[in-house]
């Protein structure tokens, strides 16, 4: 099976901005003269800059050990009542109850979501590493 992106980012080594592209065509650009860019979300890796030597591309794929993946997989959340500003939470920081709700939702609504397996692996990881 082909490996797939779970995290797509670029760091501009001139200004230090860390750019994260979370979804297809989520074009991000730093604010300095180097104009570092990151695009493609979790569909493809695209990066650039005026000086390519002054950027560092950092991507994580689903063939990495779960101990690594859990630090980079993110889930958007608007809070329990869906009334909060969107924020992204790393899988390692999602509380157990929230993780159970996520898994239940994905199983019922989006059973083919490629992250469902990662969420279930996180439950096993937590049980094993308590």
Residues covered by each model-derived region:
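Short, intrinsically disordered terminal segments enriched in charged and Pro/Gly residues
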Residues: 1-8, 40-71, 115
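Residues immediately within or flanking Cys/His clusters that coordinate Zn2+
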Residues: 9, 26-29
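Short cysteine-rich clusters marking metal-coordination/redox-active sites
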Residues: 12-15, 30
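Cys/His-rich microdomains that often coordinate metals
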Residues: 16-19, 34-38
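Short Cys/His-rich "knuckle" micro-motifs
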Residues: 21-25, 39-43
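A short, structured loop/turn motif at beta-sheet edges
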Residues: 23-25, 32, 94, 126
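Short amphipathic alpha-helical interaction elements located at domain edges
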Residues: 64-130
């Amino acid at each position: 099976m082909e490996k797939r992106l779970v995290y797509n980012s670029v760091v501009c080594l001139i200004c230090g901005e860390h750019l994260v592209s979370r979804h297809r065509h989520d074009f991000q650009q730093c604010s300095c003269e180097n104009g570092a860019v990151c695009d493609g979300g979790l569909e493809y890796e695209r990066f650039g800059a005026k000086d390519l030597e002054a950027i560092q591309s950092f991507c994580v794929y689903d063939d990495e050990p779960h101990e690594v993946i859990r630090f980079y997989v993110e889930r958007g959340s608007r809070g329990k009542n869906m009334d909060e500003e969107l924020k992204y939470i790393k899988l390692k920081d999602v509380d157990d109850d929230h993780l159970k709700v996520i898994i239940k939702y994905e199983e019922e609504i989006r059973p083919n979501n490629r992250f469902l397996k990662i969420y279930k692996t996180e439950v096993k990881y937590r049980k094993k590493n308590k």
